[in-house]
């Protein structure tokens, strides 16, 4: 069976171990109008953002400081590779566990 990938959105797991002061990220391609939903918990508060790049510019529609958990969604305003990113505290390694999923524009 061939397909265009327009099946029901599936949860993708987040399972990261991030060294003290370092970053970890999970990236995915989104089309304009796609909605990315995520849910995570971290072993300690960490800085978290959702970002993408336009040339050399980093665009951060979501930028949260010192969060240990988050559940939210964001609809992409442009087609691009988008990344969920966590920054571990300078003095502490962390683990981040959770999931993400993409709902295509129009719910497909």
Question: Model segments located where?
Answer:
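Acidic, Ser/Thr/Pro
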Residues: 1-108
């Amino acid at each position: 069976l061939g397909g265009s990938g327009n099946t029901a959105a599936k949860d993708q797991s987040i399972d990261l171990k991030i060294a003290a002061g370092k970053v970890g990220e999970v990236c995915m391609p989104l089309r304009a109008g796609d909605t990315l939903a995520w849910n995570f918990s971290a072993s300690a508060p960490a800085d978290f953002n959702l970002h993408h790049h336009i040339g050399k510019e980093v665009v951060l529609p979501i930028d949260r400081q010192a969060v240990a958990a988050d559940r939210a969604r964001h609809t992409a305003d442009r087609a691009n590779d988008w990344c969920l990113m966590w920054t571990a505290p300078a003095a502490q390694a962390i683990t981040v566990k959770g999931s993400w999923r993409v709902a295509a524009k129009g719910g497909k």
